Amino acid sequence: MSKLVWLDAGHGGKDSGAAANGIKEKDIVLKIVKKVKSILTSRYEVAVKLTRDSDVFYELIDRARKANAAKADLFVSVHINATPGGKGFETYRYVKTSASSSTGQQQKVLHDAIYKRIKKYGIKDRGEKAADLSVLRNTSMPAVLTENLFIDNKDEAALLKKDSFLNDVAEGHAEGIAEILNLKKKSGGSAPKKEDKPSSGKTKMVIVKDNPDGFLWVYNKADWNARYKKVKPDEAFTIDKTVTVNGSKMYKLKSGLYITAASKYVTVKEK
């Protein structure tokens, strides 16, 4: 059964969102989500639904309810920023989810994929953030909100007026979503490899790094929801192999447990 992606173009109708330099947020984000949908449905085995595909208004709670009712696998809300003196790109997850959570790791995948596409324009990376935003709080699936430049910054508004730039923004969104959901490509394409054996004959150890939470979860199966126990910084475990789960890598340990393979949280050394 195909995965379902819910794309939410911010604002719409009576709510223009941010507006400056002759453009409105509601119009730009609608262009972006339509491009993302086109890329995803043309390249991957996936279903994509939009909160809106025209200039109409939906309350914030209704956006989340529609996605929840459809049982979407991933919710991505697309916005343009505005604040005096602001510039750059950032993403948000719900404030009560940590960077090391499943949602946090999926946020990182999406964030990195988008920034990889737009950094050639000299865009500032403002980082992965967390906030108590309605569409993130009320959705029942992993949800990420992207803020794609500042409409009130003259230079960034000039980019937002260029279709070529919006194409890159859309490509980044699509590539990140495809990686998160491990989407299978159409026309002979194949899904990413599920497992990779360690490259050398030496024993590899994964060591937990310091992080703001002061711990990491280990899991009793290859599932980000299968939390088993917390482990502390400097604890080390023997790696059996690497697996990909919903677009993010895990190490399967010799003990049979699993831990994130994200270099932000762990380091690997040969023994």
Swiss-Prot record:
InterPro entries: DUF5776 (IPR044081), MurNAc-LAA_cat (IPR002508), N-acetylmuramoyl_amidase_3 (IPR050695)
CDD domains hit by this protein: MurNAc-LAA
EC number: 3.5.1.-
CC terms in the record's Gene Ontology section: host cell cytoplasm; viral procapsid
Keywords carried by this UniProt record: Antimicrobial, Bacteriolytic enzyme, Cytolysis, Host cell lysis by virus, Host cytoplasm, Hydrolase, Viral release from host cell
GO MF term list: N-acetylmuramoyl-L-alanine amidase activity
Principal place of residence: host cell
Protein's cellular compartments: Host cytoplasm
Boundaries of every MurNAc-LAA domain copy: 5-178
Keyword Ion transport on entry: no
Single Gene Ontology BP annotation: defense response to bacterium
EC category name: hydrolase
Function: Endolysin that degrades host peptidoglycans and participates with the holin protein(s) in the sequential events which lead to the programmed host cell lysis releasing the mature viral particles. Once the holin(s) has permeabilized the host cell membrane, the endolysin can reach the periplasm and break down the peptidoglycan layer.
Entry protein name: Endolysin
High-level lineage: Viruses, Duplodnaviria, Heunggongvirae, Uroviricota, Caudoviricetes
